[in-house]
Amino acid sequence: MRISFFHPPLEANRQQAAFIEVLQKAWEANQTTLADDQKYDLLHILGRPSHEVVEKIRCAKKKRIPILYSPLSEIAPWSEKHINHSLAKQLFIHTTGEAEYDYIKKRYSDANVILIKNPAVTVDTTQTLFNSELQQLYQQILKQHDEQVKADIDTSITKLKTPIDDEIMHAVLKGFLYLHYKYGRRQILQQDMDAQSQLMLTADYDEDKLGTILKELKLYRFVSGLETVMEKKSQLTEGFMPIPATNGRLTKHINSATL
């Protein structure tokens, strides 16, 4: 798993520094990679909800990146800064104590709030247990986020000007839309390309109609470039491509986004 980690300057915040050490031990134990590029699975943000933190969250949400936010007791009744409700409900908020959990859960009732205790400040947990719980949380976030992305794609397909009654065409289009989302994340996985190729090799649908829909969605150029990448890296062949493949600059960008 690859994550991006962000926190405000430590300054004299010993609690934050100690918790970062706990996180680092967990990442090492779980073989979690800290990414220094745009190819990561999840963004983990730590610390008080400063302007910089809020902007980081907003930017990630625009890119549809799953976010885990650990305020580390910096959101409390006496705090001057908070996250607005519309933003909070799109986050997974990690609390480290029962009082913090109860307050956050009450304040942001629509948010995903999780309690995983911090072994740096309590004997109620251990580093080993924390490692396991953090890994499970990361996996839960990725699973829920991916399910939501696919559900949103299904909804967008039902709103097309050109209606799709064919379940097979719906599935093929959904696969292209999902790969386009992953392209935006710079994270096109081999297994996802293989699944799309296999579907296209066995599917029977109106290719001309799909081409029209791809133009409606402004996905025509992307799919034509993607087909070239899929032909080279997956089992797709020309006879099963719904539109002509191209090999231009966009194709190179798509290829560089594959993992």
Model-predicted regions and their roles:
Residues 1-45:
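N-terminal pre-catalytic "stem/leader" segment of glycosyltransferase-like enzymes
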Residues 14-15, 122-136:
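A charged, aromatic-enriched C-terminal amphipathic alpha-helix characteristic of glycosyltransferases
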Residues 42-47, 58-77, 94:
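Active-site proximal beta-strand in glycosyltransferases
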Residues 48-52, 74, 99:
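Short beta->alpha connector loops
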Residues 53-59, 81-83, 107, 115:
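A short acidic, amphipathic alpha-helical/loop segment
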Residues 78-91:
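A conserved, positively charged/aromatic
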Residues 89-115, 120-122:
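A short, active-site helix/loop in glycosyltransferases that binds the activated sugar's phosphate group
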Residues 133-259:
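Conserved NTP-donor binding/palm subdomain of two-metal-ion nucleotidyltransferases/polymerases, i.e.
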